[in-house]
């Protein structure tokens, strides 16, 4: 019962991780312009994401421009696009597989089949968490490196946006859920299956008794 409750808790974490992963992939605020120097008095907030660049004005207007050219993008943005999409796909597969393999559901067949399905879903969550953690870390590193570069003007410096933090938290949720599923699927009772129950066979005694019975019949 405790294992089923733990799996349900991991499933809720995985759901939050999936929704956060998809949200972080689509949000345009992976990095925002830094409020340093002359940028403090500006009335424009510039945001850059994986798929579009957006500008928010103090008047309330909002405009976005899609990034149509893939080859013109920096390498870390191309890698972030690929890994975040893979993370979303793997986490969605993990949700479907663990829903079948969880102990609190009536799907998936016998106990062994449900355990293997649950373990496969946990592996999907772990891979999704890794694929979500790599681009957010790389993207953050590039932002910090450009911010500390003295040759870059202050108007071109940026800070990590909300999408990066959402990606970090979602990757953590997926990793925790994957570890819980992988460790809770194959819990067995102590001593079960290790030492088979002793079996006593007395073939010689049975044969002697049968032989004696047969001789008495012929007397």
Regions found by a protein language model. Name each.
Residues 12, 25, 53, 82, ...:
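Alpha-helical recognition domains of nuclear gene-regulatory proteins
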Residues 117, 132-165:
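Juxtamembrane loop segments immediately following a transmembrane helix
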Residues 63-109:
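Amphipathic alpha-helical interface segments within eukaryotic helical scaffold
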Residues 1-34, 38-48, 104-112, 153-165, ...:
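Intrinsically disordered terminal tails
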Residues 23-27, 98, 130-142:
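C-terminal TM-helix exit segments that contain a strictly Trp-centered aromatic cap at the helix terminus
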Residues 27-81:
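A surface-exposed beta-alpha-beta supersecondary segment
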């Amino acid at each position: 019962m405790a294992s089923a409750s733990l799996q349900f808790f991991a499933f809720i974490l995985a759901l939050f991780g999936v929704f956060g992963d998809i949200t972080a992939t689509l949000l345009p605020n992976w990095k925002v312009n830094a409020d340093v120097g002359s940028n403090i008095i500006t009335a424009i907030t510039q945001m850059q994401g994986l798929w579009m660049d957006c500008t928010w004005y103090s008047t309330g207007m909002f405009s976005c421009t899609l990034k149509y050219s893939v080859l013109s993008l920096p390498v870390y943005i191309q890698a972030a696009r690929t890994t975040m999409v893979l993370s979303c796909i793997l986490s969605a597969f993990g949700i479907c597989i663990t829903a079948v393999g969880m102990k609190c559901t009536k799907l998936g067949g016998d106990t062994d089949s449900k355990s293997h399905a649950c373990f496969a879903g946990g592996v999907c969550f772990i891979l999704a968490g890794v694929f979500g953690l790599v681009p957010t870390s790389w993207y953050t590193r590039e932002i910090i490196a450009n911010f500390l570069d003295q040759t870059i003007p202050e108007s071109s410096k940026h800070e990590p946006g909300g999408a990066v933090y959402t990606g970090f938290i979602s990757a953590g949720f997926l990793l925790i859920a994957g570890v819980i599923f992988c460790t809770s699927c194959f819990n067995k009772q102590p001593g079960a299956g290790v030492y088979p129950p002793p079996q006593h066979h007395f073939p010689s005694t049975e044969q002697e008794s049968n032989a004696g019975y047969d001789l008495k019949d012929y007397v």
